[in-house]
């Protein structure tokens, strides 16, 4: 079941509905980047083109967690 949250993106309020797992992953990625969740979503919003924002967030999260990990990164994980 999707969870709806309201975020302020560049001064505009918007609502976004994602599965709890995607919210958790987006929050984790934002934290790793030293960003707020809103700043993380805004970065995605600025590059999504005509794609639905919720879909763009899901794709960004999925792309991060399915990207190949270098051997050096694996050694320190």
Summary of predicted features, one role per range:
Residues 1-3, 67-77:
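Short, charged, intrinsically disordered terminal tails
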């Amino acid at each position: 079941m999707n969870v709806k949250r309201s975020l302020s993106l560049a001064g505009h309020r918007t609502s976004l509905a994602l599965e709890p797992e995607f919210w958790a992953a987006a929050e984790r990625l934002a934290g790793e980047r030293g960003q707020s969740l809103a700043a993380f979503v805004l970065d995605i919003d600025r590059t999504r083109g005509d794609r639905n924002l919720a879909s763009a967030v899901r794709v960004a999260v999925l792309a991060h967690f399915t990207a190949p990990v270098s051997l050096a990164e694996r050694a320190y994980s």
